[in-house]
Amino acid sequence: MAKDYPYGEGKVKWVNTDWLADHLDDENLMRLDVQPNVHDYIKEHIPGAVYMNEGLLRIPLRGLPAQYVSADVMELLFRRVGLRPEIPVVVYTGVGPFSGWGNGLEQTMMAYTLVRFGHDNVHVLDGGIDKWKAEERPLTQTFPEVEESDFNAVDRSEYRVEYDEFRALKDRGDVIVLDARPGNVYEGQGPWIKAGHIPGAVNVPWKSFMDPDNPRLLKSDEEIQAIIEEHEITPDKTVICSCGTGREATNEFILFKWYLDYP
């Protein structure tokens, strides 16, 4: 069955390349390029897109790497790139034409972060800029004119779980913990001091849900549902998404929360 785009439930929705092409001249639609390196953006980007690197979102905190910056800092970043809560923003990434890298998680990291810190209308470009380019759609090297905004950021606690809360929840019968890391890392071959996984966590690598040739493109709904049924993930359970640094988990968090409409 054909989808009506934007597709999804709530604060994050998915759009396809046809939809974005039809809305490319819409002044009330922001495009946010999150390719891995600024030189990827400089070399080529979707017309009208502003660049923002996911590396700005997290820094060390008291020795712990990859901790989100405060809401005050995030607010400054959001204002500088011109984000406005009333205007939808399409987020996309791809294999950078300069860096030659990009695994697709750039756009799920950014989508999750935007919502966590106060945006309510985020669109993810299914297939990313790679699909856009494969279809020979327009690209540019021109930078758009951007006015700073007055975005007010807040760190929404409902989109994260703290360590002590997690320990209290993880063994409950109505809770399922997903481990989004690759299988070999789940099995103990990762770089961590304590290799392995959280006892009871179910390993569903984030790439399981994505097209094998383009990890920015979701598999069909039928394939996604088959994976969910295989692992007995049901909407009557609280799903906690986990990984190593919180990056891989964003792919499954936005998928279950807003694509599949899990509570």
Region locations from a protein language model:
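Positively charged, proline/Ser/Thr-rich regional signature most characteristic
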Residues: 4-86, 94-98, 169-235
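Short cysteine clusters
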Residues: 243
